[in-house]
Amino acid sequence: GRQRRHYDLHSAMRPSRLAQFAICPWREGGGAQPDALARLHGLAIDGVLLQRQTSSTFSAMTATLHGAEAFTLELAEGKGEDLQPEVLQFEQGLIAMIEGRELSAGAEAQPQLLCISREIIKRSSRFRLCIPADIENFAPLPIGSLLAEDDGMRWVVDEPEACILFPMADVAEGQRAALIVVPLEQSDR
């Protein structure tokens, strides 16, 4: 039968240590297959965040309801009017896939796999992130560093190899202000 693939494309809102990355929605029966990860690597995707619970993203819906190989993709931040080399490699790889050609990445090649260790949720108007406003996605977080405070609650890094993802102080109360992510192997230790 025909293989359904859905790549929900986004442009990065901030600089990132991983130029391009994907978010793999959780679905019953497991996460991304090795061949899907190899395809992403061939599309210049550096990392894949594997979700461990359901979400309300477009890619989660197409994966669940339509059985699609679905990912949300965060593409490299543009500088001026020029496309980044990673975006051009992504575009060329996507054209090759549409034309039925094989991508150049080997079957064993995979992007870095990550998972969410913790979410930082804004609980009150006193919430503040204690990291630089211009911090890059996937910037490493030293153990013991203070990430956020909110009405007596403190988020302190206790995960080895932790990185920050999607830090946003100006979200509504009850919303996610940041994610702490770790390499997949680290989360299983």
Enumerate the predicted regions with their spans.
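Structured catalytic-domain cores with a bias toward divalent-metal coordination
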Residues: 1-189
